[in-house]
């Protein structure tokens, strides 16, 4: 008897600094509850994309823009029997901060927006993934996106003070420590800040904790190594995880599916 026909697929755009672009189709269940440390911004091209987000069900239809805030849990499935086809761009909060100059991250309530300013600002970043972005074109598109998010969010900035420069130094330092144990105390010494103030500012400015940021950068490295053909165990150790099972656990928590299924959907 012939096996089931695999209809789900994911296409990835060529790598770009600070963001990832994908186009995908799911016939039914897409992925389990998970969370990214990036903005997940996209649009449904065909069908209905249903997902749980911030305590309720959301339904993305063509013509609206999805804006999932960093570190907010969500899942994904088809809202009808026709499946759903969508494009998504994952944008590092650090890129938004570099454009806005260090302020609380813009937040779109409910994760969906019908605002035409946001739809227009995402047009370039959400075009066909087979069409590469020119570097300057990408930078212009990110500028438009950051300011559209800021305008559409309509959330007043909190009055507390924060140290953007120290948080940015911590973020850069984390990139130098992917393959070893890192403590908040070490980050605080490097940035010359109190550790809890640094942790608070990091979360406010980049939308996630220092540990989560470190874990996600390790998973970025794992995915790059897997695409190159490295075995799961080797990729896990090279990226600083204790072992393959530790990496697989965190991979599933971050992306809603295990690495083996992720590779299969990429056609690897």
Predicted feature locations:
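Basic/polar phosphate-binding segments, predominantly the helix-turn-helix DNA-binding elements
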Residues: 175, 180-217, 236-265
């Amino acid at each position: 008897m012939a096996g089931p026909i695999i209809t789900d697929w994911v296409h990835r755009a060529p790598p770009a600094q600070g963001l990832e672009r994908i186009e995908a189709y799911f016939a039914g269940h897409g992925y389990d509850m998970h969370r990214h440390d990036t903005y997940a911004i996209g649009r449904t091209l065909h069908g209905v994309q249903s997902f749980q987000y911030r305590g309720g069900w959301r339904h993305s239809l063509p013509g609206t823009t999805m804006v999932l805030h960093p570190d907010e849990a969500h899942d994904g499935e088809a809202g009808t029997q026709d499946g759903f086809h969508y494009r998504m761009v994952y944008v590092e909060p650090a890129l938004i901060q570099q454009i806005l100059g260090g302020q609380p991250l813009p937040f779109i309530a409910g994760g969906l927006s019908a605002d035409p300013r946001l739809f227009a600002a995402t047009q370039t970043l959400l075009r066909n993934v087979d069409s590469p972005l020119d570097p300057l074109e990408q930078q212009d598109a990110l500028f438009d996106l950051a300011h559209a998010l800021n305008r559409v969010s309509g959330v007043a900035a909190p009055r507390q003070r924060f140290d953007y420069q120290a948080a940015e130094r911590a973020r850069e330092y984390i990139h130098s420590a992917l393959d070893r144990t890192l403590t908040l105390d070490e980050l605080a010494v490097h940035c010359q800040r109190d550790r809890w103030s640094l942790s608070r500012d990091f979360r406010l400015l980049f939308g996630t904790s220092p540990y989560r940021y470190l874990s996600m950068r390790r998973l970025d490295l794992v995915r790059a190594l897997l695409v190159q053909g490295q075995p799961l165990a080797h990729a896990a150790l090279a990226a600083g995880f204790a072992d393959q099972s530790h990496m697989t656990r965190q991979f599933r928590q971050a992306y809603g599916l295990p690495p083996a299924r992720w590779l299969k959907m990429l056609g690897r």
